């Protein structure tokens, strides 16, 4: 009997990759949702006996979706598929009723093993002939997927890997956003930063990276109001001063920049060499941190990730800027996702 399954993810790239990862012999009808609210509506329509659920989405995220499914006792088996691989993420979704958790990028063998545990799929010597074409048609019905969708999904996975490292280091839960990806003129970037200035001051670090025809700079902009709680998490009991704050800044930037750049490199199957970190400034307005940078290009692919830590006043922005010359190579490297 054909099983209706539902793939819920705000990324068209992720939905397509999830559909292509399904076992070839599984007799299914594949449906798609872009957020949790759409998924709930489709489950009510009988279109999701199995739900593959992302966590970080607009409108209704994965955690909220699981809460609704539990409250309404909806008839669906939920398998969370996410780039948020923090230990607490898996614990939380299992606690909310998910059957299992699988990390992005998806490992097909791991997915098959989980599906076998549900009892809704069993490998056979003679796979169903119509199943694979049906899955392929469903994936193709996602329509055209832009390069920016692919860039965003690569950033999403790398963001989760960096958050996992920070969460394990500090024994916290890192709140993750949806990465923002834009192609900007450098002048537009500077104007955008000035427009977002608030009453807080920032301290910043910059680190360059290069490899296989792709180059750029990573900026960590740390809210100065976050130093007190960060010192507490790092178990520093002394008086805060600029030297201590600089040490905390360098520690956090090493984790987030290093892990995020490594996560992107692994997905592109390349290796980046990283330069020495450079302190941009301490206790200044966000626009001033980047105003003195000698830009060597006119356009940039900008990826912005805003990290925060649950139950602590800790916020920092990771800004990855790829050079204009890197874009053709970057496009070629992510073409497999489209």
Predicted regions and their residues:
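A Lys-centered signature of the CheY-like receiver
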Residues: 104
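Receiver (REC) domain active-site loop signature in two-component systems and cognate sites
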Residues: 57
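Composition-driven recognition of glycine/serine/threonine/acidic- and proline-rich low-complexity segments
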Residues: 89, 124, 131-244, 249-338
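Two-component/phosphorelay signaling modules centered on CheY-like receiver
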Residues: 12-31, 71
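Helix N-cap/capping motif at the beta->alpha junctions
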Residues: 32-41, 61-65
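Active-site beta3 strand of CheY-like receiver
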Residues: 47-52
């Amino acid at each position: 009997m054909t099983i209706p399954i539902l793939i819920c993810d705000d990324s068209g790239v992720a939905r397509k990759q999830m559909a292509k990862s399904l076992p070839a012999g599984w007799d299914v009808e594949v449906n798609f949702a872009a957020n949790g609210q759409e998924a709930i509506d489709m489950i009510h329509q009988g279109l999701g006996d199995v739900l593959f659920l992302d966590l970080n989405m607009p409108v209704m995220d994965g955690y909220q979706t699981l809460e609704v499914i539990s409250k309404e006792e909806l008839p669906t088996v939920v398998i969370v598929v996410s780039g948020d691989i923090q230990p607490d993420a898996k614990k939380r979704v299992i606690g909310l009723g998910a059957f299992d958790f699988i990390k992005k990028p998806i490992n097909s063998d791991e997915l098959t093993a989980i599906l076998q545990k549900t009892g809704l799929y069993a490998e056979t010597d003679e796979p169903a002939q119509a199943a694979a074409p049906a899955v392929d048609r469903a994936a193709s019905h996602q329509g055209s997927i832009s390069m920016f969708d692919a860039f965003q999904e690569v950033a999403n996975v790398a963001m989760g890997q960096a958050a996992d490292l920070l969460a394990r280091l500090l024994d916290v839960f890192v709140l993750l956003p949806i990465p923002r990806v834009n192609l900007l003129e450098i002048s537009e970037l500077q104007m955008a930063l000035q427009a977002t200035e608030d009453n807080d001051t920032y301290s910043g670090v910059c680190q360059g990276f290069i490899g296989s025809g792709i180059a750029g700079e990573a900026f960590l902009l740390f809210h100065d109001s976050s130093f007190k709680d960060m010192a507490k998490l790092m178990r520093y009991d002394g008086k805060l001063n600029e030297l201590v704050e600089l040490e905390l800044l360098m520690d956090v930037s090493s984790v987030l920049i290093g892990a995020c750049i490594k996560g992107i490199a692994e997905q592109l199957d390349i290796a980046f060499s990283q330069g020495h970190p450079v302190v941009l400034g301490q206790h200044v307005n966000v626009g001033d941190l980047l105003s003195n940078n000698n830009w060597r290009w006119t356009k940039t692919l900008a990826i912005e990730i805003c990290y925060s830590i649950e139950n602590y006043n800790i916020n920092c922005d990771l800004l990855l800027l790829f050079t204009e010359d890197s874009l053709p190579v970057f496009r070629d490297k992510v073409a497999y996702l489209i």
